[in-house]
Curated annotation (Swiss-Prot):
Keywords noted in UniProt: Hydrolase
EC number(s) from the headed UniProt entry: 3.5.1.-
GO BP term (any one): uracil catabolic process
Residues covered by the AB hydrolase-1 domain: 14-238
Gene3D superfamilies xref list: alpha/beta hydrolase
Protein name: Putative carbamate hydrolase RutD
Chain's role: Involved in pyrimidine catabolism. May facilitate the hydrolysis of carbamate, a reaction that can also occur spontaneously.
Organism: Klebsiella pneumoniae (strain 342)
Family classification: Belongs to the AB hydrolase superfamily. Hydrolase RutD family.
Length: 266
């Protein structure tokens, strides 16, 4: 699996891996890169089956497989310890890694994630799957912003959304891959294991998230010992995009608290 590994700002700088949600694209974190790259070595990637890592996925694709794919790629690049910032599905990958390979994960930032899929989120995905089966990639892509962004934010950016739709359709991961990745997401359940997560953990949610209720993050915090939680009052499911300034402040402050480092003296 191909990774996008940025230069380290100094030798030995902490590594921060950025993992997107169901869309899978590493470009999802564009609004965070400038805020992080002076302090951390950033690693982003397109999830297997998407973008630069396109290709058919196995029938029994699972969250454990997604986590192992990422870990193997990082190890092949010489990265053995890292923090992970994950959004939704990416947060689940982080949870899986922290449980399966705790020695590798220095910290977690879980953005609009969950322990187990809520009935509300399951209903949202059922509606989206029906759209996919009835209208194909175009219907899936055109409906997606409704679950990601607040209405006023979308209304003020229609040309941008139309351009994003066209790009997403042209780079669509494929119906079969999408359904396999979605099935892995729906089957993931960390409710019995989350108490074993030992690394520092920051949980970020948005109060107006339509797809994943903010209450899921409250449940997540209660399940992970010593975890911290910040709830943004606005921003929707993609709050790191719609209110990047607020999100980046939360993210940078959280990482600084969890990954205290001394910059190399020059």
């Amino acid at each position: 699996m191909r990774l996008n590994i940025a230069p380290a700002p100094w030798p030995g700088a902490p590594v921060v891996v950025l993992s997107a949600g169901l869309g899978g694209g590493g470009g999802y974190w564009l609004a965070q890169r400038a805020a992080l790259e002076a302090q951390y070595q950033l690693v982003s990637y397109d999830h297997n089956g998407t973008g630069e890592n396109a290709g058919p996925l196995p029938a029994d694709y699972s969250m454990a497989t997604m986590a192992q794919e990422l870990l193997s790629a990082l190890q092949a690049a010489g990265i053995t310890r890292f923090a992970l910032v994950g959004h939704a599905l990416g947060a689940l990958i982080g949870l899986q890694l922290a449980l399966d390979r705790p020695e590798a994960v220095s910290a977690l930032v879980l953005v609009n994630g969950w322990l187990t899929l809520s009935p509300h989120t399951r209903r949202c995905f059922l509606v989206r799957e029906r759209l996919l089966h009835a209208g194909g990639a175009q219907a899936w892509v055109e409906a997606q912003p409704l679950f990601l962004y607040p209405a006023e934010w979308m209304a003020a950016r229609l040309p941008r959304l139309e351009a994003e739709d066209a790009l997403a359709i042209s780079h669509f991961q494929g119906k079969e891959n999408l359904l396999k990745r979605l099935q892995a997401l729906k089957q993931a359940d960390f409710s019995r294991r989350a108490a074993a997560i030992a690394c520092p953990t920051l949980i970020v949610s948005a109060a107006d998230d339509l797809l994943v209720p903010a209450s899921c993050s409250r449940v997540l915090q209660a399940a992970i010992p010593g975890s911290q939680r910040v709830e943004m009052p606005w921003g929707g499911h993609a709050c790191n995009v719609t209110d990047a300034d607020t999100f980046n402040t939360i993210l940078c402050d959280g990482l600084a608290a969890m990954l205290p480092v001394a910059r190399e003296i020059r």
